[in-house]
């Protein structure tokens, strides 16, 4: 069994990682840290874990963590910067769910995250953990940057079009909507049920931190950085991201459905839906799947791609486990084959 | 007091119309019909009306309805086609909340609504009841076609850009999201709480009936029919539409904020928010307001317009009352000055 | 126009009070204070107020407040204790929405609220503002203690049974459920949408602060303090309280329906529903009504009373305005005749 | 592998049963019937099953079903009456999730379900499938009546008190609240999101069909039929039942916490929470657990028991699988060890 450490497991990505690892056939949580809750049992904070674990939170002790095979960071920005180097130097592999190592350009990172980059010397070895484009690099990686939730949904939706060079990349549009869990388990007025339920709005239109990450990925795929308008919105629900993507086609003859089906035929977690489909977020809730449908409305020159994920699974903890599976030679789907609870 | 008839008041636009008319200072519901519920008190079906009315539903008798000053149709498609002519010939004015008279081209209507147009001879006198572009024609109108909910939110958002000729009209995008009440008070599995809550999806991507209506309005404003990709989505909540609109700017020098503020300065129900705003659907819930914000993200060449309405008020019954006020010489805001209940 | 001051208007009872007073025909908000938000416009914090007021929050200056005819406290416990005395001495009447003056026994208050009572000398003049039992004392009151939300729903439900002496008062049960807005507009993890939606639980079973308040009221009505088991629960929604009340009948011959109808015949805000009804919280949302139904299931010896209110209206701000109307000789229903928005 | 048939798998208990069986280590769905959807793939109706099964619905053919080891009925009342006999006579075991065989008294069943009992001759062999009281009888049973959702939550909560003879059984109160999925996947106006969300109400106060079932179980346990007031309520959420139970203690000296812990110490699916707990429905969502807390508020003479289950799992399909496990000698928890997805 792979011994996994989790730093910062009191948030939503943390408890989701716990859920996945506690049911994983080849790994188990061994050290789970929280500065503020050391000594408390996990299942006292998260009653869904009662009967599944006797672990308690511990102080984030690098020595203890280094005894793990892999350490996950489910922490605010900057924490992995501060701790990853020591763990890596002791031979422990690191899977970071925060944004600390997602952007290759440290200066760009600093600009968007408003603080100096704490570990630019590690950027060279960080692998962006989107298996659908980086699968070959992940097994040998020591340091994985798990993609953000919006970047996962948006990138997977655009990749086939961009790889095939079918669209005008100057004016891509990504209209994305996320459940409230994307904002984390922090006390903030805007995420109260009274504020966020029976309500809908865009936010961060001027510029969201996931924009440079998406541009980096799409640029890698397209060969040059595209022009992208990215508008996130807050959905009155807990889990799920839907991204509706718009691109003007330069080539109207390609069978988009076939293109998508072929691109993702071998991907265990990308499900291209039948023609005419409208993927629902609930169909992937609690699972590591991304469901995608591609449309060309009214036979016009605009492609519409609909992409849904669970922001806490394929958009965070599930993708982290998928990376762990690849890093440790386990079946890629190990521990990730649950069926969405519906309704 | 204006005596108002309502045909088909058992749906959501019907009960909303009742709420507005029962509190209106210059009008009152006089005849309220329902074929299936004749004899039943309104407040037995809608307990929120207890203490506010003693009316009961009656059979839809044209003679009785013709005694009203104005008759509202809150009915499925085709009913107003069948009944409006007789009422008009008897001198009763008609405000139709269905789509029966929204499209000027009867053949186009038939194609989208899948049935022959039942009253093409009345199309000439029908006025599209969007006061923000047709205010002058409404006072003398005998027959008003109340705009659809999506068309109201989308058109009000695009109008300033199109009137000013600032954007490439070949590739407009309208990504719209609606609460479930837009689907009406019909027993259908897809709108059950178990299906529609904690879930999000697009629908009707191939072609939604509101598309030709939007194209007609935007075409009137722009001077030619634009290219528009319109994708509606279903929100896990009751009321509210948010439309996020995308257009590529041909002219980057215009102050968009000033443009929108000036265009709507005299409009009592269009509120242009301060720069950088993200209008929330709840801020207009139960009210006749449309709140709009305009952005140019990252200083790029794409304008993003965010437009919110309550689909049952400005998107249906409130706009119907606004038209009634204009038709009968009442203050345009009469009975429409309520404040949104928040939270 | 009555000039009203509001201390602490940044919470949910505050914004609800603003909504009601801004639409009130005989009163208006004149001074609205907030220590933390002085200088900010009300409609910047609460966009539903845009177009309805130009007021800004000010520092809570007793001098300014004393120029008002009446000052509402929508504050945490203890604030009204500290400020009410000075206002009263200057002739300004006080309507306190907090619990500061609800309990006549200062020692009992201290025990439940965990702090010394800050103004025991004012308790003599405080009138418990439940018009349905205290209507005669309210017009001359200088200091009103607005009842809590649960106490309003529970007391109105039990009063007819207790006044008539029909039930065993040793074992009353009140199973009450409240929307999340009852917890206020405070940043706290437990009230996040992610924690409170799609979830249900009891809380405070060991003892909730509203228990002594309910016991005081029921004791006044029954002539002696009853035995009451009161269990509150948290509903996954914003507004509304439903209380299901259980009492064993000593007398099986009384017509409970008639009893309730007669008791509340003259009450403008208590609506006894027809036999067999199940009142819905949404039917009173945004309104000052309490809807009640009384049942005797299976013809047995247990009475079941179902009572619903909007916790922010009849359970707080609406009842406060009802008291104001009575204190200043206005029609009791002035500004409180809105119809619930449904759906 | 146990070959399972499912009759009527298009409802919510049906799809939940599919989810559980598709992931079950010792059983698999072999025949899945639906009269109205024969020929359609399961995953076309339920997209969460995409990638997990290639099965399609078939006509309910008794011959095909009889080839299964066990057949589950997830059907409206009366269907199992009509078909169970033939299957049993062919040696196929039957697990009925409907109410057809829950009540031992056929006349009583007819009275509550408003139709003649269709198979009274089978009642003798039907075993009420609540393992916590009937575990010994289940392995040899040929016909299992899976308990209703409310009866499961209420009975498990009351059993320890009644078995120990600690309470006055004349005036038990069960105030129960259920998510909307309890009403099934039927098109009905009352269960639309627009009707059931942001709303709460009691229903069926005069008499709910689960009442005689609860009385039968509690009577078995207590030795005589108790007096019970049972009031169900509709929660604005999808899954979960919470039952708050009230009973007057005859004996004040018993340690209720110890009583409950001992009673359920060996039960794999009943989790007695620590003293002072308030179990949340979400902590059992998607799982077969019942979580229970017992309180004696204010040290008084009334016991309050809080019991939560997922109505579709421990209240239906999960309990059905638990019975199957016991019937076929599998580990009782096989396929039922998932962790609730939280948040």
Swiss-Prot record, chains A, B, C, D:
* Origin superkingdom: Bacteria
Please indicate if the UniProt record lists Hydrolase as a keyword: no
- Pfam families linked to this entry: Semialdhyde_dh, Semialdhyde_dhC_1
Where does the record place it? Cytoplasm
Q: EC? A: 1.2.1.38
Q: What class of enzyme is it?
A: oxidoreductase
Instruction: Describe which pathway this protein belongs to, using the record's wording.
Output: Amino-acid biosynthesis; L-arginine biosynthesis; N(2)-acetyl-L-ornithine from L-glutamate: step 3/4
Database matches in Gene3D superfamilies: Dihydrodipicolinate Reductase, domain 2, NAD(P)-binding Rossmann-like Domain
Catalyses which reaction(s)? N-acetyl-L-glutamate 5-semialdehyde + phosphate + NADP(+) = N-acetyl-L-glutamyl 5-phosphate + NADPH + H(+)
GO CC terms in record: cytoplasm
Tell me a Gene Ontology molecular-function term this record carries: N-acetyl-gamma-glutamyl-phosphate reductase activity
Q: Which Gene Ontology BP terms does the record give?
A: L-arginine biosynthetic process
Sorted keywords for this record are:
Amino-acid biosynthesis, Arginine biosynthesis, Cytoplasm, NADP, Oxidoreductase
User: Which SMART domains would you find in this protein's record?
Assistant: Semialdhyde_dh (SM00859)
Active site residues per record: 149
* CDD domains tied to this protein: AGPR_1_C, AGPR_1_N
Q: Which family does it belong to?
A: Belongs to the NAGSA dehydrogenase family. Type 1 subfamily.
Q: What does this protein do?
A: Catalyzes the NADPH-dependent reduction of N-acetyl-5-glutamyl phosphate to yield N-acetyl-L-glutamate 5-semialdehyde.
Output this protein's name: N-acetyl-gamma-glutamyl-phosphate reductase
Originating organism = Thioalkalivibrio sulfidiphilus (strain HL-EbGR7)
